[in-house]
Regions:
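N-terminal signal peptide c-region/cleavage motif recognized by signal peptidases
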Residues: 5-7
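N-terminal activation segment of mature serine protease catalytic domains
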Residues: 9-61, 92, 100-102, 124, ...
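Active-site substrate-binding loop(s) of clan PA
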Residues: 14-15, 92-94, 108-143
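Active-site region of chymotrypsin-like
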Residues: 22-35, 39-41, 106-116, 144-242
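Catalytic-histidine neighborhood of serine endopeptidases
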Residues: 52-98
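Beta-strand/loop subdomains of soluble extracytoplasmic proteins
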Residues: 72-77, 82-91, 125-130, 144-165
Length: 245
């Protein structure tokens, strides 16, 4: 029995080695001469991962700032590399899906290794997964961290309340257009938003880490939202990429 468990255990370090070059940070950048008076030159907002052509990046829609400081020449950027050797590449939003909180960015420069996407609808409860990203990016910097767990449940993004009087406007909207999300037993932190959730053995992406969208609906009634982590299924990433072709 112990021997049967070894291949899966040994697979994660090898998988992480393949995944890591495709993980990027998403944020904003300002020219150094403008940064002092208008905040930091670099601002990490979340995580993204490279797909498709190697110049396409998937992240959460909520990671993208609603507006940029034009006076300070602030620009949307993707940060590649590791630690002090990282570089900023200017990015632009190609397509977005606010309803499922995913966005597709395009970056310049040399193509990066792209992650493969799993087929939609193949995730099973109990499946071993991992996700890699930049938790607390502004503090910990460009050092990607990996967390491991399982898919605990495939669950609706919102569950109807006992009384309609307790429903928020966001919950009502979600009840009218429901979809399932993945509940994970691994903990994500601020900065992990947009991280790819992938199968431990194959490395194929099955979802995108998201807490903001789900907690507005599924846990809206809780005074202290739980530490449960959720992920948006990869089918919505596929739809975004298909629409960009």
């Amino acid at each position: 029995l112990l021997l049967c468990g070894l291949p899966a255990q040994a697979a994660l370090p090898d998988t992480v080695d393949k995944i890591r070059p495709s993980i990027v940070a998403v944020g904003t950048v300002k020219p150094a001469k403008r940064a002092n008076a208008a905040g930091p030159a670099l601002n990490y907002l979340g995580t993204g991962f490279v797909v498709g052509s190697g110049r396409q990046v998937i992240t959460n829609f909520h990671v993208i700032p609603e507006k940029l400081d034009a006076e300070a020449m602030e620009a949307l950027a993707v940060f590649v590399g590791r630690g002090g050797s990282g570089e900023a590449r200017q990015a632009r939003v190609v397509r977005s899906d606010p309803d499922h909180d995913v966005a597709l960015l395009e970056i310049g420069g040399a193509a990066l290794p792209a992650l493969q996407l799993a087929e939609s609808g193949t995730v099973r409860e109990g499946e071993e997964i991992a996700f890699t990203g930049y938790p607390i990016g502004p503090v910990l910097g460009l050092y990607p961290a990996t967390h491991r767990g399982i898919v605990s449940a495939v669950t609706p993004i919102v569950i109807p309340a006992m009384s309609s009087r307790t429903l928020t406007a966001e919950q009502v909207r979600r009840i009218r257009s429901p979809f399932d999300v993945y509940q994970l037993d691994a903990t994500a932190y601020p900065g992990n938003s947009g991280s790819p959730v992938y199968n431990v053995q194959s490395g194929r992406v099955v979802g995108v880490i998201n807490s903001v969208l789900v907690k507005k609906t599924k846990e809206a009634a809780l005074a202290d939202p739980s530490g449960i982590t959720y992920a948006i299924p990869v089918r919505y990433v596929r739809a975004l990429l298909d629409g960009a072709r």
